[in-house]
Amino acid sequence: MNWTELSIIINHEAVELATNILENHGSNGVVIEDSDDLINQPEDKYGEIYALKKEDYPDKGVRLKAYFNEMTYDDKLRQQIKDELLNLDELDQHNIQFSEQIIAETDWENEWKNYFHPFRASKKFTIVPSWETYAKEADEELCIELDPGMAFGTGDHPTTSMCLKAIETYVLPQHSVIDVGTGSGILSIASHLIGVKRIKALDIDEMAVSVAKENFRRNHCETLIEAVPGNLLKDETEKFDIVIANILAHIIDEMIEDAYNTLNEGGYFITSGIIKEKYEGIQSHMERVGFKIISEQHDNGWVCLVGQKVSE
């Protein structure tokens, strides 16, 4: 399977909304190459500096790179994305540029290695690419070794980072966890590192399940996490203490009742992938079903909600 890389150069003011548009239309990740980063080359959180190459960045503005399955990226989708971008009030229409290229599946892993380095994703969790060596800064630091492959979920997106923070807060070793839309398996691995013994990881994409299994192996938990293809929670008959879902808002909306029914009394529904424009609707739906909202995180236009199943 090949992938279409859609590259868009836009002004800074439109980056957040443009990223949301690309992800809402199914982009498997968005790379942000900001020309300002060349001026303010940051030191990463664990004390090493990665030199940036001028040729990798636009002369001005921001380059967004979005990745779509070549089989589903057609003229209709291309035009929908372009129309929505051009309708943004924040967009400087005189300086927007579009380009595309095909990336073969065999090139995909190496493409992502250019952007993925160890980083602290939350208070406890550090994400470490499988091809790099990293020394822990503290005994309590929990390292997740990851190769995102085709499934992404590297932990650097605000939704994943917020889910990791929620896992730190609400998941206990005695809990059972089901991770819906596991992707790279990062949230299941985090639950394992917390000490959870019963974890089930679902994804409708069999390739994602395969990538997740490989990441479980890298983190020495392949025999401890059940990874299977699954269509949300529609066929789930088991009960769990924690349901985690970091997926698109409209899919979350479809599964709220099933999440409630899957949880044990007092259990938690940790969910993100929700843009700020849609979170009030998701929150209201959760409350109508019976969830008590106990946590609400916001980060760069994204929201993570935690609802608890409680009886009246």
UniProtKB/Swiss-Prot annotation:
Known EC number: 2.1.1.-
> Where does this polypeptide localize?
Cytoplasm
Asked whether the keyword Cytoplasm is assigned, the reply is: yes
The record, for CDD domains, names:
AdoMet_MTases (cd02440)
**Induction context:** By heat shock.
What are the cysteine partners in each disulfide bond?
A: none
**One example GO MF annotation:** protein-lysine N-methyltransferase activity
**Homology family:** Belongs to the methyltransferase superfamily. PrmA family.
Q: What is this protein called?
A: Ribosomal protein L11 methyltransferase
Upper classification of the source organism reads:
Bacteria, Bacillati, Bacillota, Bacilli, Bacillales
